[in-house]
């Protein structure tokens, strides 16, 4: 009562598994990429054009600008690890900000201009 589908002795299944993957599916070794020597790279660059070398020189000169010595902090003026109190009246005045009391006064002065609508 067995059929060809349920019978383990069927020859059809054996032949279908033998060629499950075609040879063009990446089973072969990868092609080796031969790196160029430095001499070959230089020759190719020269063949492409010599104007690239002039542009490279300009870029190098721009990166070598002089450093302004006035922006360098003298020793002992580092700010790393220093606690700064930004809430003091002196700090707020120096920054041009108003203190809490002045802000509260400004708020109360503007209140008389506002008219509430019911």
Swiss-Prot record:
Compartments, as annotated in UniProt: Nucleus
Amino acid composition bias (Polar residues), ranges on this chain: 1-17
Biased composition (Basic and acidic residues): 82-92
Chain segments annotated as coiled-coil in the UniProt record: none
Compositionally biased spans, kind Acidic residues: 36-68, 102-112
A Pfam entry, by short name: CHZ
Annotated stretches, region: Disordered: 1-118
Annotated keywords: Chaperone, Nucleus
Gene Ontology CC annotations of this record: nucleus
Stated role: Forms a chaperone-bound H2A.Z-H2B complex that acts as a source for SWR1 complex-dependent H2A to H2A.Z histone replacement in chromatin.
Family: Belongs to the CHZ1 family.
Subunit structure and binding partners: Forms a heterotrimer with H2A.Z-H2B, stabilizing the association of the histone dimer. Also, with a lower affinity, forms a heterotrimer with H2A-H2B.
Protein name: Histone H2A.Z-specific chaperone CHZ1
Source organism: Laccaria bicolor (strain S238N-H82 / ATCC MYA-4686) (Bicoloured deceiver)
Gene from which this protein is expressed: CHZ1
